[in-house]
Amino acid sequence: FDQAVMRKPNRSYRRYQQIAELVNTAVREKADMLVMPEACTPKEWLPTLARTCEKNHLAVVTGVEHIIEDNCVYNLTAVILPYEEKWTGQWHSVILYHSKNHFAPEEKRMIESLYLRAMEGIESSEAECDAKYELYSWNGFWFTVYCCFELTSIRDRSIFQSYIDALIAVEWNQDVN
């Protein structure tokens, strides 16, 4: 987190190997879905990950390393879903994004201490936006994705009550790592 927000992201081969090993283990174990932590995967590596997903019919939910653009910090979660094109039989994958609706207070303080702005949800103006969450269906499995501090909102957690098979949470906290 610190390196990414200070514009010094880690793109080392060692880091790439660690993520590749996670994905390759999921493929070897014939997993249907792999869930990785918040801020885990650099955005530049998502297309490569998506190609692996389509070749192996593996769904992936991963936190995207914080993105900084125009002094705004975005915390995204990527949902990569492989699918078969019915008329050709070819496999493809789609990358969908969830923008974190609620930053943790300490995360927000750290970002603002660097004179950056934490972009919560899908903000189209300076006004606060309503929290937005996506409902996914993949192979008959209905799920939604929440990113870390979003889970603290009882109201937000209840949005998909009786609609989903699972609420997938990506997080990166010292107390759970």
Residue spans for each PLM region:
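A local structural micro-motif
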Residues: 34-35, 61
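Short, flexible loop segments at the rims of nucleotide/cofactor-binding pockets, characterized by
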Residues: 9-15, 36-40, 121-125, 144-150, ...
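Short, surface-exposed connector motifs at secondary-structure boundaries
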Residues: 28-34, 137-142, 162-167
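Long, hydrophobic, well-ordered secondary-structure blocks that form the structural core
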Residues: 42-43, 52-55, 60-87, 97
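N-terminal, active-site-proximal structural segment of metallo-dependent hydrolase catalytic domains
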Residues: 1-33, 40
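CN hydrolase (nitrilase-like) catalytic-core segments centered on the catalytic cysteine
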Residues: 40-65, 142, 151-177
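Active-site catalytic loop in hydrolytic enzyme cores
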Residues: 72-161
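Amphipathic coiled-coil/heptad-repeat helices and related helical stalk/stem segments
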Residues: 15-19, 45, 129, 152-153
